């Protein structure tokens, strides 16, 4: 085990929106170290959101951030062995972990969609998540349901 917690490495903001959250998302989206390709996919998805959105009061980046917020879980279940039995114990999630889980789920369920390009899939999943629909939001709901069902074991917290 580590002697102390690893230091957080500073992330550079992305070139178009000057936002660190976007860079973090692109790092999760990236495959085989191809960051420029991942940035292109993300920016194309943002442009698609811009064309598909209904209301004019929100920018496409705000819609993406809303989608991320709607996918973000607040509680999760963790396994813990107590006297030979394994219990699923509901736990609060740290803020940075909430964001990472939301990003990973949004990307995972975008990849599972069946549109032509990854940019189109990501745009569709973001638009769906912004409206509280889609597979990524369903995953969050399922996680919350699981935590609610196992609320009785919350006194076993770590």
UniProtKB/Swiss-Prot annotation:
One of its GO terms (molecular function) is tRNA binding. One of its GO terms (biological process) is translation. Part of the 30S ribosomal subunit. Contacts proteins S9 and S11. Belongs to the universal ribosomal protein uS7 family. SUPFAM superfamilies: Ribosomal protein S7. CDD domains: uS7_Bacteria. Keywords: Ribonucleoprotein, Ribosomal protein, RNA-binding, rRNA-binding, tRNA-binding. NCBIfam families: rpsG_bact. It holds the Pfam family Ribosomal_S7. One of the primary rRNA binding proteins, it binds directly to 16S rRNA where it nucleates assembly of the head domain of the 30S subunit. Is located at the subunit interface close to the decoding center, probably blocks exit of the E-site tRNA. This is Small ribosomal subunit protein uS7. GO terms for cellular component: small ribosomal subunit. HAMAP family: Ribosomal_uS7_B. It comes from the Bacteria.
């Amino acid at each position: 085990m580590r002697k102390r917690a690893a230091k957080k490495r500073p992330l550079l903001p992305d070139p178009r929106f000057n936002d660190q959250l976007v860079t973090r998302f692109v790092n999760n989206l990236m495959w085989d170290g191809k960051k420029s390709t991942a940035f292109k996919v993300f920016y194309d998805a943002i442009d698609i959101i811009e064309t598909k959105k209904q209301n004019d009061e929100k920018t496409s980046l705000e819609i993406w951030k809303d989608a991320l917020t709607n996918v973000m879980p607040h509680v999760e279940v963790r396994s813990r062995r107590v006297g030979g039995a394994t219990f699923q114990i509901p736990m609060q999630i740290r803020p940075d972990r909430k964001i990472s889980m939301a990003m990973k789920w949004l990307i995972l369920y975008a990849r599972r969609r069946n549109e032509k390009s990854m940019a189109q899939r990501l745009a569709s999943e973001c638009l769906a998540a912004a409206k509280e629909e889609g597979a990524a939001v369903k995953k969050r709901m399922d996680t919350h349901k699981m935590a609610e069902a196992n609320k009785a074991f919350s006194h076993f917290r770590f």
